[in-house]
A protein has these predicted regions:
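Long amphipathic alpha-helical scaffold regions
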Residues: 1-232
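Alpha-solenoid helical repeat scaffolds
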Residues: 2-8, 17-21, 35-40, 44, ...
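Short runs of predominantly hydrophobic/aromatic residues within well-ordered alpha helices
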Residues: 66, 120, 345, 397, ...
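Hydrophobic residues within the alpha-helices of tandem HEAT/HEAT-like
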Residues: 88-91, 123-131, 171-179, 320-325, ...
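Amphipathic alpha-helical protein-interaction segments enriched in hydrophobic
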Residues: 394-399, 445-459
Length: 561
């Protein structure tokens, strides 16, 4: 019988002096007591545990019973006055805090995903009680505990929002006494107090990364006061409470400190992902925005946010929210010397061209256009030139060339003359626009957007900028443009039309033919003859559209005096 075995081992241990118990004693005590608990004999175990004669035995060995007790309490959902719960509470009072903490954290780490919520919620209060028993030397153990809890909460199934909400709320209650202590002692200059403040900072940074970085709120402009919003609000409040300035954290990359007190290296203390999400919470969801000073200029805030935007580009709401605060035509060209002012739009182009979700591609295009609008004239010139060289996508190149046309149109209006979209500076940009990516062998269908916008720009220049004025310089370079752009384009058009007309004839003669198309080494469904013919007609119509604009340009040139 387990009860008899437990009584025997306890009686034998009572005779041992100075708590010199052997590993075998520990094993026998744990096995017998666990079996009693599992078999429902918790009353007998409780009587042994609370017996004053066994106090030293329980203090040394009792922590081994935490695991079995937690499993029983979670499984059986026993009431608050049950023997098992009484045993658990008594162990928390008399056992070594360090050994209890290890045992409790083992239970947290061992929890399977389907019981993480129940395990975490049950153990938060015992863990808090044990940590408070460490006194002023709790910081390291608190950090270990918070890291374990957050790692387990991150393993919750994504669909378990209720469980995540409970755990986040419970976690805030758990850290409350430690936060208050860190607030009260933040200027004490004592090493233990600084370590506690550092652990609270680590907790906030970890929380900003997970769960807050991996989860979406509701609509940024119409969000409910959800548990996630409340959790984020409290995390930012803790940061402020322990002496971390939110504006300084936001501008951390720009105003990086070289000497940081404490034992953490800077990149560990202030992870980039956490700081990026801090900016996202501030400027997209307006959490704790009332603490942010209004004296900081929108341009400075944008500059601070660019590092964060680069990390969070899939959520380019932060880019948009940072840009809308900036006045149009106000960003100086010097900002383009900062790497992120080029890399962020380049990455945004990837979203615009590669993202499978139409809504996100459209939103990306709108933000890209917004970024163009914010630069001054010289900034627009250099930004558009850089993007035209690096985008390598006809649709994006078409958007860029259309923006160039709009800037030229603006510069030709009375009172808006500038040196960047006229004359000597404009001609190199125009040469870049009026070129075929692969010369006469360029795929006209694949490059349709770029080619049509290039032709529209050239036609506009020839009509709007009279040869007698020649403000843009286009008339001086006309022969060069004819040789490098229009003649190769005409040759390309003739070859493409001949090829597709031949294909159309073949398709009409062989009505039984089936066309197979492969993409990425995978065959797509075969095209029927009717679909083939329709596609060929569509291509020929596109060539006629290109040719009509090209002919109009040639007519304008021929009609010059």
């Amino acid at each position: 019988m387990a009860v008899d075995q437990l009584s025997d081992i306890v009686q034998r241990c009572q005779t041992i002096q100075d708590d010199l118990y052997t590993p075998e004693d520990y094993d026998l005590f744990q096995c017998a007591a666990r079996k009693c608990i599992e078999e429902g004999d918790s009353v007998h175990v409780l009587s042994i545990i609370v017996d004053e004669k066994n106090k030293h035995i329980v203090r040394c060995m009792g922590w081994n019973l935490v695991g079995p007790l937690v499993l029983v309490l979670l499984k059986n959902e026993e009431n608050s006055v049950s023997p098992s719960r009484a045993i658990f509470s008594h162990l928390l009072e008399i056992c070594s805090p360090k050994e209890l903490l290890v045992s409790l954290l083992e239970q947290v780490e061992a929890a399977e995903p389907d019981v993480i919520r129940d395990t975490v919620m049950f153990l938060l209060q015992p863990l808090q009680k044990v940590l408070l028993n460490f006194g002023r030397k709790k910081a390291t153990f608190l950090g270990m505990t918070l890291s374990t809890l957050l790692n387990q909460i991150a393993r919750l199934p994504q669909e378990d929002t209720a469980g995540l909400g409970q755990c986040c709320s419970g976690l805030l209650c758990f850290v409350k006494p430690f936060v208050e202590e860190a607030k009260d002692t933040r200027n004490s200059g004592v090493a233990h107090d600084e370590e506690l403040r550092t652990e609270m900072l680590k907790f906030c940074m970890m929380s900003l990364r997970d769960p807050l970085l991996g989860l979406q709120f509701t609509d940024p402009d119409q969000q409910d006061k959800s548990f996630l919003c409340e959790f984020a609000t409290e995390i930012l409040a803790i940061l402020s409470g322990i002496g971390e300035s939110l504006p300084e954290l936001l501008c951390h990359e720009l105003l990086k400190k070289h000497e940081v007190p404490g034992f953490l290296e800077e990149e560990v203390r202030y992870p980039k992902e956490s700081l990026a999400n801090l900016a996202y919470l501030l400027f997209v969801h307006h959490i704790a925005m009332e603490t942010f000073p209004v004296v900081l200029s929108p341009v400075f805030i944008l500059q601070c946010n660019m590092e964060h935007i680069e990390l969070l580009l899939s959520r380019y709401d932060l880019y948009e929210k940072s840009l809308v605060r900036v006045e149009d035509n106000s960003l100086s060209v010097e900002l383009l010397e900062i790497k992120t002012f080029i890399s962020v739009p380049q990455n945004l182009v990837k979203v615009m061209t590669l993202c499978p979700v139409h809504r996100l591609r459209s939103k990306g295009l709108a933000v890209f256009q917004l970024s163009i609008n914010k630069f001054n004239t010289e900034g627009k010139y250099k930004f558009l030139r850089c993007m035209l060289k690096t985008s390598h996508h006809s649709g994006v190149e078409g958007v860029i060339i259309k923006n160039i046309k709009n800037q030229v149109d603006l510069s030709l209006r009375p009172g808006n003359k500038n040196v960047w979209f006229q004359g000597i500076h404009f001609l190199p940009l125009l040469r870049l626009v009026l070129s075929l990516p692969q010369g006469p062998e360029t795929d006209l269908l694949q490059n349709l957007d770029r080619i049509m916008e290039s032709l529209n720009l050239l036609r506009y220049l020839l009509i709007r900028d009279k040869e007698s004025d020649n403000e843009t310089g286009v008339w001086l370079e006309l022969q060069a443009f004819n040789d490098s752009f229009m003649t190769p384009l005409r040759l390309d058009l003739n070859m493409s039309k001949a090829h597709y007309q031949a294909e159309l004839s073949n398709a009409g003669c062989d009505s039984e033919s089936v066309c197979t198309v492969s993409v990425g080494n995978e065959n797509l469904p075969n095209l029927t003859p009717e679909v083939q013919i329709q596609a060929l007609h569509s291509a020929l119509f596109t060539f006629e559209l290109i040719e009509s604009v090209l002919v109009r340009i040639e007519e304008i040139i021929e009609a010059k005096p």
